[in-house]
């Protein structure tokens, strides 16, 4: 089996709000139809799908309805990412210390899906080196 693309798909009752939020967070754009929106990142890669779920009930992290899935967005400037997320309609759920060398904050997107903004995690080259040196 060859996987040619993997995409996270969120349910949402308000397709335009949810897809616009994620397109703005990723610096990308949205392709729309009546029941499914495709979110592309700034480089034009298909990253997120948003499907119409008129009766969608958002997760209530951490205690209520289960979160099902969440995204981690790793950034170099956590304060700027926080400001952008909140300006776009994210709701902070759990604070983190943006002055710490490594950490994360938890938010809910407009449809209530939790996501994290993290910083100080290994860069892609470090991850590739680790995987190259630790394969069986």
Predicted regions and their residues:
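Core segments of cupin and vicinal oxygen chelate
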Residues: 2-3, 9-53, 87, 93-95, ...
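Active-site-proximal flexible loops/turns
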Residues: 18, 84, 116
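Vicinal oxygen chelate
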Residues: 5-13, 39-42, 46, 59-84, ...
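A short, polar/charged loop-to-alpha-helix boundary motif
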Residues: 121-136
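Polar/charged alpha-helical tracts
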Residues: 80-83, 87, 129-133
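Short beta->alpha transition motifs characteristic of CBS
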Residues: 52, 117-124
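A short, acidic/glycine-rich surface segment
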Residues: 55-60, 125-126
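Short, compact, well-ordered microdomains
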Residues: 91-119
